[in-house]
Swiss-Prot record:
One of its GO terms (biological process) is protoporphyrinogen IX biosynthetic process. NCBIfam families: hemC (TIGR00212). This is Probable porphobilinogen deaminase. The gene is hemC. Binds 1 dipyrromethane group covalently. Pfam families: Porphobil_deam, Porphobil_deamC. Its cofactor is dipyrromethane. It comes from Methanopyrus kandleri (strain AV19 / DSM 6324 / JCM 9639 / NBRC 100938). HAMAP family: Porphobil_deam. Gene3D superfamilies: Periplasmic binding protein-like II, Porphobilinogen deaminase, C-terminal domain. It catalyses: 4 porphobilinogen + H2O = hydroxymethylbilane + 4 NH4(+). Its EC number is 2.5.1.61.
Amino acid sequence: MSETIRVATRSSRLAIIQTREVIELLERESPRDVEVEIVKTKSRGDVVRDRPLHKLGEKGVFVKEVDRLVLEGKADIAVHSAKDVPSVVDYPVDVAAVPPRRDPRECLVSRHGGLKELPRGATVGTSSPRRRAQILLERPDLKVEPMRGNVDTRVSKVRRREYDAAVLAKVGLDRLGMTSEVSEVYDPEEFVPPAGQGALMITCRKDDDRVKRLLEVVDDEKSRVEVETEKAVVRELGVGCSEPVGVHVRARDGDHVRLVLGLFEEDGSCGHVLKMRGSPEDVVREAVSQAREVLSDG
């Protein structure tokens, strides 16, 4: 017996690649035949390109329009980059699955090699306060300028010498077949990524038990634990993409995880990287407690 499922996604090249990755996984793992229809849309984050994301005045700018197709019954599921999904969603969808996570690391695309090799005063492109803070913490002499656009656009801006370098998520370059553009890759404990980077989240309506059962075969327990723990930290701290905060979790055997939380000043004047191990619940509680102490000390 076959199942029909409509998949909502953003219309960018990377989003379509991510969606096809999910479809292929579902077709491979499902005990039933699955017929899939892709439903494309554009998010506010895709349309508004003249401002940094954190200045758009709302959360989930890459997510809401896609989830709306699900809520309106025009699609059964939506595929998102987990880093784009807010830690608090105020409308009736559930995360039905987190497929196996790919590379969570940040990387540099550069005309001059690594970050340390960039000439004094070089211009690095990013609109992320978190990336800006960590770049300036390492190299306060650099100029960090806003950079929006999809992955192809940002790489092209470096090639055209509009910027000397740019910091991006390595997974996006990998999925686009552009890994050769990477000049340097950063350990997530040294250059802390945002919650959810490298993972996908598949959402559906809260009451859609049929879809939830169908997606059980693509839900990866280890990846879900990592992403949910990262999201729990930012939710408890009440921070989002507008704050220079990064968090990365690596699940170990059983209920054991390692958590890294980075708290920074956007101008690069100060940075604190907290590291801890334990159960997901314990590390969230400890990370939030230590972070609040750091933040209260200024």
